[in-house]
């Protein structure tokens, strides 16, 4: 069963900031593009089997089924909702 993957405004801002930091601060637009591509591709793969990554082990997040997916040096925090078949990406952090 396929899930719809959505990003919160905060997660979208995180992606923009990751790109900006690598492209501007580290002066590597090519690496910024590559990192953004890897993050986006991996996030979109959450449409299948979103439960495959571990549950965040602290309350109140554990009881809300918050999950953590590593991508390179980043962590993608998301919540799958099985009732409506959605995955909501909350944040992307270094």
Regions found by a protein language model. Give the residues of each.
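Enriched for short, Lys/Arg-rich terminal
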Residues: 26, 71-94
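Basic, Lys/Arg-enriched alpha-helical interface segments
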Residues: 1-65
